[in-house]
Curated annotation (Swiss-Prot):
The gene is baf-1. Keywords: DNA-binding, Nucleus, Phosphoprotein. Disulfide bonds: none annotated. The lineage of its organism: Eukaryota, Metazoa, Ecdysozoa, Nematoda, Chromadorea. Phosphorylated by vrk-1. Phosphorylation by vrk-1 in mitosis is essential to achieve correct timing of recruitment of nuclear envelope components during nuclear envelope assembly. Dephosphorylated by protein phosphatase 2A (PP2A) following interaction with lem-4l during mitotic exit, leading to mitotic nuclear envelope reassembly. Belongs to the BAF family. Gene3D superfamilies: Barrier-to-autointegration factor, BAF. DNA-binding protein which plays an essential role in nuclear envelope formation. Required for normal chromosome segregation during mitosis. Associates with the nuclear lamina via its interaction with LEM domain containing proteins emr-1 and lem-2. It is found in: Nucleus. Its main location: nucleus. It comes from the Eukaryota. GO terms for cellular component: condensed chromosome; condensed chromosome, centromeric region; cytoplasm; nuclear envelope; nucleoplasm; nucleus. GO terms for biological process: chromosome organization; chromosome segregation; embryo development ending in birth or egg hatching; response to X-ray. This is Barrier-to-autointegration factor 1.
Amino acid sequence: MSTSVKHREFVGEPMGDKEVTCIAGIGPTYGTKLTDAGFDKAYVLFGQYLLLKKDEDLFVEWLKETAGVTANHAKSAFNCLNEWAEQFI
């Protein structure tokens, strides 16, 4: 599976204080919806990923329900956070 430039840039360095839109699959529209729901930073969304026990199905469903993220974009976000976790924790 090939990854986007956005994905590679995100997983290539510590998360720090990056905006949620820095995560692959999360563009401006989904970013606004997530921010409105309280998930404005990448680390906040990463916390939700951890709360859902790194489970792809649960995380994808949660993103779909919370911000109307499509399944494809939600899977991109999951893969991005999952690969980041494998490298940094």
